[in-house]
Amino acid sequence: MAQSFSMVLNSSFTSHPIFCKPQKLIIRGHNLLQGHRINSPIPCYASTSSTSVSQRKSANYQPNIWNYDYLQSLKLGYADAHYEDMAKKLQEEVRRIIKDDKAEIWTTLELIDDVKRLGLGYHFEKEIREVLNKFLSLNTCVHRSLDKTALCFRLLREYGSDVSADIFERFLDQNGNFKTSLVNNVKGMLSLYEASFLSYEGEQILDKANAFTSFHLKSIHEEDINNILLEQVNHALELPLHRRIHRLEARWYTESYSRRKDANWVLLEAAKLDFNMVQSTLQKDLQEMSRWWKGMGLAPKLSFSRDRLMECFFWTVGMAFEPKYSDLRKGLTKVTSLITTIDDIYDVHGTLEELELFTAIVESWDIKAMQVLPEYMKISFLALYNTVNELAYDALREQGHDILPYLTKAWSDMLKAFLQEAKWCREKHLPKFEHYLNNAWVSVSGVVILTHAYFLLNHNTTKEVLEALENYHALLKRPSIIFRLCNDLGTSTAELQRGEVANSILSCMHENDIGEESAHQHIHSLLNETWKKMNRDRFIHSPFPEPFVEIATNLARIAQCTYQTGDGHGAPDSIAKNRVKSLIIEPIVLNGDIY
């Protein structure tokens, strides 16, 4: 696969007889990175500004639905110190409950699950790990009930413990199948279903668990269980917990938990207040990014492209919602906004000649070379150049690391992959599935996003990590494959209407001589296998710090969410809009008597 990928990238350029002399890098007003030299030649084309308008495509993207004035009008209603004081008091009470030594250990385990799903887990990482370590030290993950055994397994794997799936063998019959007597235990079946998505490649018992629970949970009759449990089953069948983005799940679970008769009032109020306070932080970040995006002026200049600041910000919240990651969210919002704009240049507006030129100039990272670009590409290149250089300058100033070569390599590789897809489109060439995917997991932009994300985390960088980033370690590649396959499942119809032929669905159909439904099944199967590989990659032989591992996994989760019912990024429907509103715009109603 690595060889195929190299061949794809090497085939992305066309040789030209005339070249511009490489120049030294320049940063706006900074000379910190002077001395880096460019080895790649720049093809010198004649001006492309006279290209006929009729040669350019139009995607007819829907307009932006979140305008500047609306975003600036958000009130940040829970940023007051009064709420912060109340939140600290509630959190201390939750901490006391978690650390209660008199509580039965399995009761505490269920409490931890509620704490995590309510969105409070990040406040109690130390306490949660202490409880889970008790289960490891006592070797007591096996319980007589299926639901508690599965819950223990899931939580331990979520926190990186390589607990064996063999603990489920006691629930098998003499033929190696799950006992039919388990079917009536809906809570246990649901718990096993959720646990099965933490499986590694080759864990047959968890594959059996997934097939067994999926079949029987889908067969449940509404009258057989209570409404809350039915709601939980339907929610899980729609998308399992392990593949959901944390903050949207917290909103849903808080509202569901509030209807439970056994709900803990302290947990519930702590979760509601925390959600609203985090939401105010997100709104503040969003307003700052809205001002940045308006100041960039790209949207009115490049009217053919998608204006998707809110959707880009939503991606970053899905990757890292915690207040401490404000700088990371803002940096990634800039990156993803530029990716969206430049993607439309390649997909919709640029001629092949212009795209080859733009790709080569980005690879050179030469500010002087942009003079040969058409006007719409000049503003795009300069926006990219200034933004990436500014991020690199901040890292050099604050961390002492020169990260520019890693950032520009990721951008260059992505644009080469963009260019390959543009060639396939114009040639009406349908590549073989493997050839397509070797290019497409790079073109989907995951490596650019995650490379920036790593450096925005401000970690102490090691040589091993830098090599892993440069070589696109599995923790960059696996989320990118999931991102790509989800994207194709959600956008293939619109892409076909635009005349794009390179798509995993079409390649799969053509190569295997199968119909669209069978191709979708194949892609979903590949998605599941990639998740299994990533589950192991998360903690086995990973050189990356844990926060980055979680952010990389969250990239796959936000991709699943965005493309679950269509193209939630390029053509957001009412479902996508409501997700944004529930996560970023609309607070949860609090108990007025308390505050």
UniProtKB/Swiss-Prot annotation:
Cofactor: Mg(2+); Mn(2+)
Binding site for (2E)-geranyl diphosphate: 306, 343, 347, 484, 487
Gene3D superfamilies (UniProt xref): Farnesyl Diphosphate Synthase, Terpene synthase, N-terminal domain
Pathway: Secondary metabolite biosynthesis; terpenoid biosynthesis
DDXXD motif (motif): residue ranges: 343-347
Catalytic activity: (2E)-geranyl diphosphate = tricyclene + diphosphate; (2E)-geranyl diphosphate = (E)-beta-ocimene + diphosphate
An annotated GO cellular component: chloroplast stroma
Note describing how the cofactor binds: Binds 3 Mg(2+) or Mn(2+) ions per subunit.
Residues the entry annotates as binding Mg(2+) 3: 487, 491, 495
Residues that coordinate or bind Mg(2+) 2: 343, 347
Localization annotation: Plastid, Chloroplast stroma
Keywords of the record: Chloroplast, Lyase, Magnesium, Manganese, Metal-binding, Plant defense, Plastid, Transit peptide
Comment field on protein domains: The Asp-Asp-Xaa-Xaa-Asp/Glu (DDXXD/E) motif is important for the catalytic activity, presumably through binding to Mg(2+).
Family, similarity comment: Belongs to the terpene synthase family. Tpsb subfamily.
PANTHER family: OS04G0344100 PROTEIN-RELATED, TERPENE SYNTHASE 12-RELATED
Protein's UniProt name: Tricyclene synthase EBOS, chloroplastic
